[in-house]
Design a protein with these regions (language model features):
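N-terminal flexible/basic segments that precede or flank functional cores
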Residues: 1-44
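Short, charged recognition helix plus adjacent turn
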Residues: 5, 9, 97-105
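Short alpha-helical DNA-recognition segment
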Residues: 50-71
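DNA major-groove recognition helix of helix-turn-helix/homeodomain DNA-binding modules
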Residues: 82-98
Length: 105
């Protein structure tokens, strides 16, 4: 389902003003990636970057070029595990999230 521009703008605005929402979206992104829903997980991470750290700042902190990061987090992105972890760690730091792992039975 294609999202409307207004919906996207609403989500980005809420990420900026609601830390709990941003944390929930981060959790959703990681869960999607772990469940093999790569497109969805990368899309959510991209929204988090747009609304919080910005691609320019993420590039500065990770050492990747902005265009590389845009490609990495695109629907067709195929980041290596090392690069993806570097990006997610940087997003966590920016959002003040301390990840914890809980395994389901």
């Amino acid at each position: 389902m294609a999202l409307t521009r207004e919906y996207k703008a609403t989500v980005l605005a809420r990420i900026k003003r609601d830390p709990k929402f941003a944390k929930a979206l981060y959790t959703e992104a990681v869960n999607a990636l772990l469940e093999g829903e790569t497109d969805e997980g990368l899309s959510i991470l991209r929204d988090l970057v747009h609304a919080s750290i910005t691609f320019k700042e993420l590039a500065k902190q990770t050492g990747f070029g902005e265009k590389t990061l845009h490609r990495m987090l695109s629907r067709r992105g195929n980041p290596t595990t090392r690069n993806l972890f570097m990006v997610t760690r940087t997003i966590c730091e920016e959002l003040g999230i301390k990840p914890e792992v809980k395994l389901a039975a």
